[in-house]
Amino acid sequence: MSDLYLTLKNGMKMPRLGMGTWMLGEHLSIYQQEKKALQAGLDEGFTLIDTAEMYGNGLSEKLIGDTIQGYSREKLFLVSKVYPHNAGRPQIYDSIDQTLHNLKTDYLDMYLIHWPLPNPK
């Protein structure tokens, strides 16, 4: 079972496998299908969910927030990413607040800069 997790330097255990959510939540016509797919993954033990504020302009985060209700937050490993242009002060505070609101949680397990370079033109 220990092979399923990577122990980070702070002692936290991060699942080695997870679910990416790029392009999820963008189309209301398949929202329930996407929610069921995420639930199926969670039910099978895929507890790491990766998203970003740019995925559907927050709609992916909102889908995840709706989906994880009823699951133990402590058993999930939520990762989100901030746009590079929002990574400075004060924008990063607004971005993380919006992400937490969208995900309906009060903390993230990991928060990353989506890419460390200026936005492509």
List where the protein language model places each region.
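A structural signal for isolated positions on well-ordered beta-strands in alpha/beta enzyme cores
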Residues: 77-79, 109
